[in-house]
């Protein structure tokens, strides 16, 4: 009985803390990678609570979705994607399962960070698997270029200002 009561109290406390932080203007941000999460934390400061789905040691092309990812996406106010189809193998089912209209592509809470930078290595002509590991939409590892970090940060700043206009 005591264990059940402890679990119930913990769940209620989590719900209250989550609701209070959101009511105080904290945005829940989910990102594809830790790199994007780091940028979001630096830009948003104490106004954001950031969760990265892919860990730094993981290949961001092949992330094994977890149930906790669906919950994070369901609660998110903003999702920041690498884009360029990097997440194609694992993100679409998460977005669908999240049932969160705010973070769907094209919605106010969806940011494709690749749209803020110049993309390199966009292949031309017919693309086949015989060419090896080719990214049809261009190199999605653009965030590794140090100068692009500033451009991504500016896009994140603009999106956060749109979502929290009183704090802009």
Language-model-detected regions and their locations in the chain:
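Positively charged n-region of N-terminal signal peptides that target proteins for export
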Residues: 1-5
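Bacterial N-terminal signal peptides
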Residues: 6-18
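Extracytoplasmic metal-acquisition and chelation regions
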Residues: 23-168
């Amino acid at each position: 009985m005591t264990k059940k009561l402890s679990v119930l109290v913990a769940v209620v406390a989590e719900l209250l803390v989550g609701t209070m932080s959101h009511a105080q203007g904290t945005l829940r941000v989910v990102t594809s990678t830790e790199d994007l999460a780091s940028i979001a934390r630096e830009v948003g400061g104490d106004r954001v609570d950031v969760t990265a789905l892919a860990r730094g040691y993981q290949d961001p092309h092949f992330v094994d979705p977890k149930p906790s990812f669906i919950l994070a996406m369901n609660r998110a106010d903003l999702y920041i994607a690498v884009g360029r189809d990097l997440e194609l193998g694992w993100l679409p089912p998460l977005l669908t399962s999240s049932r969160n209209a705010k973070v769907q592509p094209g919605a106010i809470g969806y940011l494709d960070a690749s749209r803020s930078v110049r993309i390199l290595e966009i292949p031309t002509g017919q693309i086949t698997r015989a060419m090896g590991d080719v990214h049809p939409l261009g190199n999605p590892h653009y965030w590794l270029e140090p100068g692009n970090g500033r451009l991504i940060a500016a896009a994140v700043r603009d999106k956060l200002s749109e979502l929290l206009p009183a704090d802009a």
